[in-house]
Structure formats: structure tokens, C-alpha cells
Amino acid sequence: MGYNKSLRYSRHDGTSCVIDNHHLKSLGAVLNDVRRKKDRIREAEYEPIIDIADQYMVTEDPFRGPGKNVRITLFKEIRRVHPDTMKLVCNWSGKEFLRETWTRFISEEFPITTDQEIMDLWFELQLRPMHPNRCYKFTMQYALGAHPDYVAHDVIRQQDPYYVGPNNIERINLSKKGFAFPLTCLQSVYNDNFERFFDDVLWPYFYRPLVYVGTTSAEIEEIMIEVSLLFKIKEFAPDVPLFTGPAY
């Protein structure tokens, strides 16, 4: 808007205007009043619902529920992922799973020494780019209810994947509804026969995940994959036996 000469003169010729500061309010105070009024309206809407909801107990996140989390890192591996494709993380057959370029097993022994009951089991995947200054996102697809005899393909095309969660870490809950895990000394089974540990101990009670990972990059990328299992153990079973005898 340009300069208008008529704006220099008052419309009220020959009169004076007196402004009373008691009737002025800052814009911030007005906005705060509006916000407080909205909060009071929202609280009035939720009051009858909150009274009913207070009678129920829910967990905010199953991973943070009751129990103790025990992590066992299976392996770290570097994979080369091509554009518009996704690679299978592990096929759960044999000790090496899927060995491609480099594999290092972290946990040689199971970290739980006594009879334990597993309340929940998570498959945790951590992804990291191997080259600096790479601007792409990690994508992922997975299936839980696959038939035990199904042979998964090592590479698939990306079709409607979703992005991996914050910090490039994704957790998948493997619990089956209505399946209770028996008390088992997991360390002895894990150390005696690692190859059969999954088929004999875990998969009858938990889902066997088939997980594929990829990137949004248009080039071949090298990514670091770290695979872990997170066991949620009941707290009543101690890590160290408190007594000695035939029952322990």
C-alpha cells in the first residue's frame, strides 16, 4: 500500500480523543484467556469419561510393562542393499543364519542362569548406514504367521513398506495369544544346542518373524544390521539361586 496524503489528517476535525489505558488489553493476554477457556471446555467434556476410565488399568507400552528385560544380541552384519529391493534379515536356519559379508556373534552364552518363565519376546533390529553423509531412510516389512516349512526369499521388491522407527531401531512383539511359556532353564538349552534352541524352545510358543529391510536410496547402500532378542522375564525368578538343593 502506497502513501496516502489524506491519512495525515484526522476524520474528526476540531475534536480530541482521550484513550483510557484501563480498557486496553495486550494481545497475549487475550490469547491466554482463549486458551484457558478452551481448556475448561475440554475438561468438562472429559470429566464423565475419566470417572469411568479410572476403574481400569492399562499399560502405556507393553515393552515397559512389568517384568525384567534381558537382551541377547545374536549377530551384527554388513549387508549391501540394492535400490527398490529389500533383503531378508535372517532365515532362522543354522547357526550362521544368513552370512553375507561379515558376521560376528555377540552373546556366546545365554545371560539367564536359572529356570525362568518368559512373559514376552521382542525381535529388535538396529540399522546404521556404513558411509557418512548419506541421506536416506530405512524401510521394513515383516511377517509373523508364516508356515514352518515356508522357505523365504532372500531378496524381494519394495511394495508398500513402512519407515523404521526413531533412532533406526524397530521392535516386533512375537507373543502368541493364549500361549503360556513353561519354566525352562534357557541357558543349558542355549549352550547345548544353539541350532535347535529356536525350533524346540522358542517357536512353539512365539512367532517366527520374517523381516525384510531396505532403503529409500537410489544407489547401492551398505548398512549395518544388529539383531537382538529381548526377553521379558518374570521378576519373581531371581538371576542367582538363593538356595542349593535338588529343586534348584
From Swiss-Prot:
Molecular function terms from GO: structural molecule activity
Keyword Nucleotide-binding: no
Keywords in alphabetical order: Viral occlusion body
A Pfam family per the record: Polyhedrin
InterPro entries: Polyhedrin (IPR001746)
GO CC, alphabetical: viral occlusion body
Superkingdom assignment: Viruses
Family the UniProt entry places it in: Belongs to the polyhedrin family.
Function: Component of the virus occlusion bodies, which are large proteinaceous structures, that protect the virus from the outside environment for extended periods until they are ingested by insect larvae.
Protein name listed in UniProt: Granulin
Lineage: Viruses, Viruses incertae sedis, Naldaviricetes, Lefavirales, Baculoviridae
